[in-house]
């Protein structure tokens, strides 16, 4: 019988594709949302009232943020942690990006330790941004491997929101690995580190005037007029549906303690 899976940040671009895939494979899914309104919207969107339920987690940062949600769902055996801030217009990088990402990850792992001993696999959505050296983005000799980390420090991250995002992914991921190393938990860990994630919204109802950051990059191109100047932009990219498949494959195929 398929497992029950908890997906944090269930309203997210990647998360919705993950949940759509999980439901199609017969899994029961519990998603965390920031408000009951968002949760009700997802129930209607997924159209699977018997298979999808939600728990309200208003903020990632408060200590014990995920405790209640996990206490209520002893049936969950897999946890997919996708929730993390992406705000490249952040004015206070530490407050809006770094602390929520790192504290949120720590809160998830502590909650699993205390209230989810039955959970056997945790998958965290990280990013290649945690790995590559930004100063060498155009360097064809720059190789990124499972052992790579970006060189951005906590202090460096405050220079601009992009550095802040890169640092948030790095330090949140390091917090996950450090927990596993120090606590020796019952679960195994997998990290998904995609490049720039593009693709359609999971459902037509999620198509809005302004989309999530990565999808909006393409949306803006489609809205250009013949007179518009084409923006310069180059990046490796991956289809969001493949990213969703990677999250599910990580626990189905037992890619244990790998990036």
Q: What is each of the regions a protein language model found here?
A:
Residues 218-258:
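Alpha-helical substrate-binding/gating segment
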Residues 183-186, 199-215, 249-259:
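Glycine/proline-rich active-site loop of Rossmann-fold NAD(P)-dependent oxidoreductases
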């Amino acid at each position: 019988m398929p497992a029950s899976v908890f997906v944090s940040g269930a309203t997210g671009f990647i998360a919705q594709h993950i949940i759509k895939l999980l439901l199609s494979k017969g899994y029961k899914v519990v998603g965390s949302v920031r408000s009951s309104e968002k949760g009700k919207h997802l129930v209607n969107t997924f159209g699977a009232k018997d298979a999808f339920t939600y728990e309200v987690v208003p903020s990632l940062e408060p200590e014990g943020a995920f405790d209640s949600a996990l206490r209520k769902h002893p049936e969950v055996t897999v946890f997919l942690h996708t929730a993390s801030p992406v705000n490249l217009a952040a004015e206070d990088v530490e407050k809006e990006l770094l602390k929520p990402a790192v504290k949120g990850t720590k809160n998830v792992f502590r909650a699993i330790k205390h209230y989810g001993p039955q959970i056997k696999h945790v998958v965290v959505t990280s990013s290649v941004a945690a790995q590559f050296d930004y100063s060498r983005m155009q360097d064809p000799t720059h190789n990124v491997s499972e052992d790579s980390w970006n060189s951005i420090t906590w202090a460096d991250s405050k220079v601009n929101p992009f550095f802040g995002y890169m640092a948030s992914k790095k330090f949140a991921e390091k917090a996950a690995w450090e927990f596993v190393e120090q606590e020796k938990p019952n679960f195994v860990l997998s990290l998904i580190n995609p490049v720039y994630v593009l693709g359609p919204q999971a459902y037509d109802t999620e198509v809005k005037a302004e989309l999530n950051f990565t999808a909006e990059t393409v949306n803006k191109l489609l809205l250009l007029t013949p007179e518009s100047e084409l923006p310069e932009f180059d990046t490796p990219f991956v289809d969001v549906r493949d990213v969703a498949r990677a999250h599910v494959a990580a626990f189905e195929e037992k890619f244990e303690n790998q990036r």
